[in-house]
């Protein structure tokens, strides 16, 4: 049977036209609703389609564009899809229905409370790693697994599936150390300092870090203001072989790649459940070849972990999952009642790190002391020093300048050390009355920093001027908001005024 004349007359050859639409790593294709392919295939908005250019292909979400942006024979792609397909203007594009995803059955089952087996979790994670899921599917999976709905067995299987989704590194050392913080505490940028101290003391630390999930900066975000962090596996090995440590972004490596996809959606949801947190941390460490991992868990009323009961539940989960993979972990409880250091946001936190490593008199004392505590614990845990002697060794390494020299070596090996930038716009938030600081809300401060543009805008964030129990006078700056755009500054300031992050009691 012949096609209707109006359809037959339409061109059935699709070419790529760049529009520069950034969907933050979600693959999207844009087509005219009246093009021959859309009509013939019955495509509707939000359909999942397979897009092919030459030998490269991916699964994308379809958006229909009825305006004059696209001719009927043209398609466009989101920036991430362009990069994956290496698309160039005029390339011939083939679009067809995406294969049905059998693993979505497991996601639906989990939504209704089912326990998933090893095969089901491997299937879900495999499809996520291959970018076959839309963000809405990933969000459904994350939500279904949150709120204590994952058993220990499921968490172990999830971790294994995430490890299996990528490559694994091996090292010819009996002890391979690592350090991680569960997050939730603004400014707690101890990892670069701990890595520098421990590596200068002789430990091997192939440290890979994630970007921020629910916070205004992750270690990778902060380090990116100082040096190159997107290293390949070959480059990472070269850096570690040369200087004994790295401070790289795990997302640039194929180590638990499913985790990086999950983190992107977790950031949008502002959700980080115990099971997902454990699987995320440990899958990366296992894939990196770590044997001994120190995990910093800040506990406080507005931190991610809010009570000793929550801490104990997380500790047991982390230890049980790690044990099943033959990895040793030690959990260190730290104070989560207020931010650490002065800066909140990538560049501001980087300045704090540099101040501590360079032994500046103005360096944040709390960041220095916490870093020394964690470094000392890691040195003792790995047997680099006798029990009880770690703090003396860590302090000596830092105060002698050896840690700073090691940090310089790491940065130079990764591409060179640079100076963090500064924000164009700043605004003080001041005390409205005389009194004493009785509470600092970590979550409000994190939200203020994120509204100012962090971590996407590296120089954005919050600079703290007070700590708990400080005496303040009316009009004294409590913190300064840094932003790179005036609109983001005003948005952040408005939130800060409506949601006070610093509580002051009159004296």
Curated annotation (Swiss-Prot):
GO terms for cellular component: cytosol. SUPFAM superfamilies: Nucleoside phosphorylase/phosphoribosyltransferase catalytic domain, Nucleoside phosphorylase/phosphoribosyltransferase N-terminal domain, Pyrimidine nucleoside phosphorylase C-terminal domain. SMART domains: PYNP_C (SM00941). Keywords: Glycosyltransferase, Transferase. Its EC number is 2.4.2.4. One of its GO terms (molecular function) is 1,4-alpha-oligoglucan phosphorylase activity. It catalyses: thymidine + phosphate = 2-deoxy-alpha-D-ribose 1-phosphate + thymine. Gene3D superfamilies: 1.20.970.50, Nucleoside phosphorylase/phosphoribosyltransferase catalytic domain, Pyrimidine nucleoside phosphorylase-like, C-terminal domain. GO terms for biological process: pyrimidine nucleobase metabolic process; pyrimidine nucleoside metabolic process. Belongs to the thymidine/pyrimidine-nucleoside phosphorylase family. Type 2 subfamily. This is Putative thymidine phosphorylase.
